[in-house]
């Protein structure tokens, strides 16, 4: 069987959920026994989102091989339970960088380098790249942006060319659009969708399936109207109605017959019925919890829902694993101090201090750590959260009042968190942090070892600063146990306080490897500790 290529575009408005639709379709195909992966093409000129402010772009998701990518790759991995890579996220910046580098090397033999064919050819090469590995039966490509945006037109043009270069049964186009509901008229309006599809068709791409995001049910008459004016088969207009959980969307799409439509169009015979039992069991636990807890998520970017997307989803997975409803209270670190910590955090069953960069909000994070440590509240720190746990311990247990990270105070007399040695000569910001999966050896008898149930793990990282091992002995003697280290470098990966009911913090980002069917163990045990306290 030839590799099949599916493209998902969006129209009318942004943030309709192309990534969720792409991941849901991938789940339906995977459940039928196909090998599927998803790639995201982003139209911005940044090489990657690694240097983007979370307020600009939401979470930066890190893959196993150390790529800093769009947060949609997190959805892909969570829905499919697979690892993506740097090849799964392409930006306009990467495309231009490749083409300009080739031009400087003389690869174009003196030709004038243009959007068409040089940029579009590179787009096509990247779109087909994963398919040529032989590892996948189906490649789903999510095209970022909204049809009509000037930035994404080279991607659409590459799609147009592939639509005619590939065999008809190997190419499929899905267009996700919005059907707004006007309360005054009490009507769903199809005109924006008609115009969006017409604009896509004017660019030479003819969608095979139209997925309509809607608050209300689409009547058969409306579906027929959309099909008529958008030139698709009547049965190929489907609805994606608002769901109570994003993990319900694959089941909704299966009920809409999306999986069968795609398989039939791509002419893939002999597939079994989809096996979605594990997903259904997860949703059953999620929908009917037996317990409930309240957890504080203390961060710097809490105003934007997507800034801590993987953490939020990991908590959902852990809650379902414990049959527990977890209410996450996102708290701005800048608003927390020693004086109000009891008022702000006193009703919480657990405290999670989130990752981040820079000085803003650090003292609030330290106050949150102190409250959790001194009031026996279950505590979980991630990346910067671990670093602030170390600073808090140094200040309030070791008595080093001026202890700090050199990230914010290069002249501190007690640099308990310091810049990694191999980072001190780095001047370029993009893609130069310690990124991707690294091994961590767990100490025998530690909480971390009991949680993971193994001696060695591999987790993903995104940081420049580390625990200063010059303070290792003092910290351990005072009660902060180092329970996880990198076996090659000795870099401290996990700290915990054995005398505390549950106090653990990691330099790595465990949230990047949690899925509904395989929830991350640290999150599962953190939620369990919160339940035990309640």
Residue ranges and their predicted role:
Residues 304-307, 320-324, 338-341, 360-364, ...:
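Extended hydrophobic-aromatic, low-complexity segments
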Residues 271-274, 380-381, 400-406, 449, ...:
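Acidic/polar loop patches that form or flank catalytic/metal-binding clefts of enzymes
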Residues 10, 40, 214, 241, ...:
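Active-site proximal loops enriched in glycine and acidic residues that flank catalytic Cys/His/Asp
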Residues 435, 439, 443-534:
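C-terminal and late-domain segments of enzyme folds
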Residues 16-19, 23-27, 31, 344-439, ...:
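Cysteine-nucleophile active-site neighborhood
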Residues 1-327, 333-350, 357-358, 365-371, ...:
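Flexible phosphate-sensing "switch/lid" loops adjacent to ATP/NTP-binding sites
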């Amino acid at each position: 069987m030839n590799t099949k290529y599916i493209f998902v575009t969006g129209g009318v408005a942004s943030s309709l959920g192309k990534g969720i639709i792409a991941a849901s379709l991938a789940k339906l195909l995977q459940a039928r026994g196909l090998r599927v992966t998803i790639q995201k093409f982003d139209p911005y000129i940044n090489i990657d989102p690694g240097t983007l402010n979370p307020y600009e772009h939401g979470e930066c998701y890190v893959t196993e091989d150390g790529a800093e990518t769009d947060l949609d790759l997190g959805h892909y991995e969570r829905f499919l339970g697979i690892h993506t890579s740097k090849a799964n996220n392409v930006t306009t910046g990467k495309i231009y960088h490749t083409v300009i580098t080739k031009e400087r090397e003389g690869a174009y033999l003196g030709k004038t380098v243009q959007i068409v064919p040089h940029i579009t050819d590179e787009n096509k090469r990247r779109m087909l790249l994963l398919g040529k590995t032989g590892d996948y039966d189906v490649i789903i490509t999510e095209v970022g942006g909204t049809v009509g945006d000037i930035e994404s037109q080279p991607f659409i043009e590459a799609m147009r060319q592939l639509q005619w270069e590939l065999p008809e049964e190997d190419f499929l186009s899905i267009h996700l659009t919005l059907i707004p509901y006007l309360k005054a008229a009490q009507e769903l309006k199809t005109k924006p969708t008609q115009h969006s599809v017409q604009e896509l068709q004017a660019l030479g791409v003819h969608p095979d399936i139209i997925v309509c995001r809607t608050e209300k049910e689409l009547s058969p008459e409306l579906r027929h109207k959309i099909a008529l004016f958008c030139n698709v088969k009547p049965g190929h207009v489907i609805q994606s109605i608002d769901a109570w959980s994003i993990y319900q969307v694959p089941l909704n799409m299966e009920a809409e017959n999306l999986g069968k439509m795609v398989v039939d169009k791509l002419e893939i015979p002999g597939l079994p019925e989809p096996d979605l039992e594990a997903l259904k069991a997860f949703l059953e636990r999620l929908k009917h919890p037996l317990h409930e807890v309240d957890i504080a998520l203390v961060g710097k970017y809490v105003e934007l829902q997507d800034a801590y997307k993987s953490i939020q989803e990991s908590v959902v997975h852990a809650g379902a694993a414990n049959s527990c409803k977890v209410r996450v209270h996102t708290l701005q670190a800048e608003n927390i101090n020693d004086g109000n910590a009891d008022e702000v955090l006193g009703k919480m069953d657990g405290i999670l201090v989130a990752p981040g960069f820079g000085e803003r909000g650090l003292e609030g994070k330290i106050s949150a750590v102190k409250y959790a440590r001194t009031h026996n509240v279950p505590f979980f720190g991630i990346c910067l959260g671990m670093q602030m746990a170390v600073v808090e311990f140094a200040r309030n247990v070791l008595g080093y009042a001026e202890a700090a990270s050199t990230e914010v105070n290069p002249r501190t007399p007690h640099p308990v968190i310091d810049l990694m040695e191999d980072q001190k000569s780095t001047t370029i910001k993009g893609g130069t942090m310690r990124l991707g999966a690294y091994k961590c050896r767990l100490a025998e008898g530690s909480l971390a070892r009991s949680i993971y149930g193994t001696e060695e793990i591999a987790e993903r990282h995104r940081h420049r600063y580390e625990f200063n091992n010059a303070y290792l002995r003092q910290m351990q003697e005072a009660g902060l146990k180092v329970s996880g280290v990198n076996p090659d470098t000795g870099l401290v990966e996990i700290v915990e306080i054995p005398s505390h009911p549950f106090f653990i913090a990691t330099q790595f980002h465990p949230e990047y490897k949690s899925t509904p069917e395989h929830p991350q163990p640290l999150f599962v045990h953190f939620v369990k500790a919160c339940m035990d306290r309640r």
